[in-house]
Amino acid sequence: YWTDVFNKDVDGCGSDLDEYARRLLICALTYGHCHTLVDFPAPSGARSLAEERALNRRPYWIEVDPTNVYGWRLDREANYGNLTQVRIGEKAVVPDGEFGEKVYDQVRVIEPGRYRVFRQEEQKAEMQGPFPYPASFDQSDATAEYELVESGDFSLGQIPLVTIYANKTDTMTSKPPLLDIAHLNLAHYQRQAD
């Protein structure tokens, strides 16, 4: 059952496994690594596996850009290198009236067996570019107030985040594999411009 479902729709948005893997590869080549977070919909009251399948409740994969991973903690004692916490920046689009929407910065904090979501209290006023979403997170705003808007537990005893490396330097860090070529191209074009 799962093989057929994941081959057709791995992320809950209609992307098949090939398309999803292609996006991860592009991200890993760009940044040196990328992440996949495995999530599961909130409980819906289904009482059997057949009911869950009828409601299409199943795990799905979320591509996490490395620039949105704000920080992490590793177990340095018992199980060296295992994640004990990860903080992921997200955008929350909240309905505002009949037709409007508000976009908030939020941070998802995931630890083994539990998660919390903190949302910035004030909506970002400036929108950049032709899209209705802010272009990037403003991590420099240390005075921003965040409030806890969601929390919960899950039965998995570890953080469901998988990191794919193209050029690993350490846990959760890497060097973009094409960076040297980019610098060489830049130097070439600068010499040609003179």
How would you describe each model-predicted region?
Residues Y1-D194:
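Extended alpha-helical, oligomerization-prone segments that build pores/tubes and scaffolds
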